[in-house]
């Protein structure tokens, strides 16, 4: 005690001096009075072990309780599914519980929070199975996630099944709509797949299914596509067989009619939609091929025969190919087979109407379906616009009038069948009709009269602007030219006193002086004429500058005001000069000097007193 400095007390337990021993004693009493100083650090760890054991015990109990609950749920679900499913699917359910127990017991010793997460994940993964089984009656199996049937149904439209033989396609399509055949397929798939793929535990991943999936996809690609060049009778017979098989299978669901059909091309998801789409595609392809066969046999009559029936048959073949691809992409929703049939019949009855249809329409048969919902009046106006656009391209407007007056044109204007107007509507796909959309449309009965009234009103004021006349004819409002315009109105001749014509004067200069040009000016000289041309050039340049700067906001307003000021000054200058010309100039000479001023023919003298 005497060796230590003052105010230092030695702890009786740890033998260390402290300034405040009372604050240190509670900590030393917990260690114990008989513990040496060397072993203090090593003995502190066993003191925390009881706390860890107390924390780990309840967690294990919770994990075991959750595992038991999952086992009971799996047993209840298995007991419910025993009434509705075969035996081989029941064996797949107890596996998730075993995998869950292993996962929870192994992870419980390592971490405190991690064992709870797999249990919730397994609950989320196992519950949607029952809801999915309640929704679909045909797919009432737990092996849907493990067997590659579901993936095959998703990848089947991409493999190009609709292009193969229609009998094989219809038969393979019927496999997905029959419940007993699905059970047989499940047995075949379960026999071919290994056991680790059939399990539905939480440790299952997609990389185990990918090899089997790739093999099945290779099998799908190796399926023979069949002969695409089928006679129309065989195609129609195939469609009838598919329909009869569908009706028989819907009536008797318990019987298995297709036991020998290969299961590699089975469709299990949404069978009804696939049947409808496939039947529509088969109808479309059969009708297109029938049309091609009939066209090759009969050929196109009259002037189309000179063009060649083989080329048209090839075009129709390409058109049917495009129709097949459009049907495959759009799901056979906007296609109407009745339009193609009526078009074929109308071409057989009245072949001379095909001369009015452009040749490019054969490549655009897929756009005919979009015009099926339009009315007859709108289609007639579109037909008129097409004819006007063709005449405007060749600058032969009177030919359209002659066509309208001819009996063939009247037959083409009459709304006899939808296919005629649809075929004519396809010709409007050219860029010429895009500009024609801005023209005013009216019913085709009163179209010419309304256009004539508009022409009579709009031609007023355009008589002295011959450069606008070709553009006015290009509008195509009337099939003929305006009647109020004559040769003098097309080429107005403005003669100046000097004998030169003003036909080459700019449009803006003529618009500013068209009133004065009607009556030739009396006092117009060479200097004045050059001044007027200069003013016209300034005005033209000002308008060009104004159009470019008008978009700049405040600067455009200022330029506009200055331009008006300049125009007013030029007008007042010309008026004042004309008024002041006959008057004599006043002399500003001193009175002591006599000056004689001559201005033109007028002379005046100032005399001194």
From Swiss-Prot:
Membrane topology category: Single-pass type I membrane protein
Extracellular face residues: 1-554
Membrane-spanning residues: 555-571
InterPro entries with a match to the protein in the record: MTNAP1
Keywords annotated in UniProt: Membrane, Mitochondrion, Mitochondrion inner membrane, Mitochondrion nucleoid, Transmembrane, Transmembrane helix
Main location class: mitochondrion
Transmembrane in keyword set: yes
Compartment(s) where it occurs, according to its Swiss-Prot or TrEMBL record: Mitochondrion inner membrane; Mitochondrion matrix, Mitochondrion nucleoid
Stated role: Critical regulator of mitochondrial DNA (mtDNA) abundance. Binds dsDNA throughout the mitochondrial genome without sequence specificity and controls mtDNA copy number by promoting its replication. Also plays important roles in mitochondrial metabolism and cell proliferation.
PANTHER family linked to this entry: HYPOTHETICAL LOC287798
Entry protein name: Mitochondrial nucleoid-associated protein 1
Organism encoding this protein: Pongo abelii (Sumatran orangutan)
Lineage summary: Eukaryota, Metazoa, Chordata, Craniata, Vertebrata
